[in-house]
Amino acid sequence: MIKNTKKISDNNDSALMRSAESDIIENTEDSKSFSVSYERIPHKKVPSDSRKLVVICASTGGPKALQTVLTGLPFNINAPVIIVQHMPTGFTASLANRLKAKTGLRVKEAEDGEKLEKGQFYLAKGGKHLKIVRYRGSYKAVLSDDLPKNGLKPCADVLFESLLKVDIDEVVCAVLTGMGKDGTDGIGKLSEKKNVYVIAQDEKTSTVYGMPHAIDAAGITDEVLPLEEIPKAIERVTGTF
């Protein structure tokens, strides 16, 4: 009898993702404690040839949500796409391969020192912080062994804070389902210095309405949307090439 190996593989992947998510729950801060406010610079539309980045962050429920978002994004999106999914060492390579297979997009685990390209999707490596630098006219990924921040490594706040030092015209931020408030402080600080557009997943479609709630409570969201509508919003702001 021939077994359905694809179904077995999908089930194994799902079990791995659930295991990885359970590992980070205990280290995630409660979003209800969030009370900081930011003096945000209003978002402004920029030309299509501007320097852009898309950053998507997620925690609990993220792998499934990421598949939905990436499935709706074009292969020729006009920016590198950085993904921070809370996962420990050893899980993010499998997630990147799964997302690549399911969506047909160029998804990979970020490597230290690599140049970031438009239309490429980079997943932060589990057990490492991902930072972005600009070097000789290009954006590059830097993997860091700095201590966990708020119990998280990778941590979206660390990535967003690295962008404070980068010359960039626009950062499109999407905050998806997850416990805690990772991403809020980093985006908040970035919004005071850079041109950002912030999208949060709504409560109804979130597995855990923690991270999206925190960013919206901080008063720096441009849109709060059902999960299925987030890809079109990202594409509308970012454009294609």
Short names for language-model regions:
Residues 1-241:
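Strand-loop microenvironment adjacent to phosphate/nucleotide-handling motifs in alpha/beta enzyme folds
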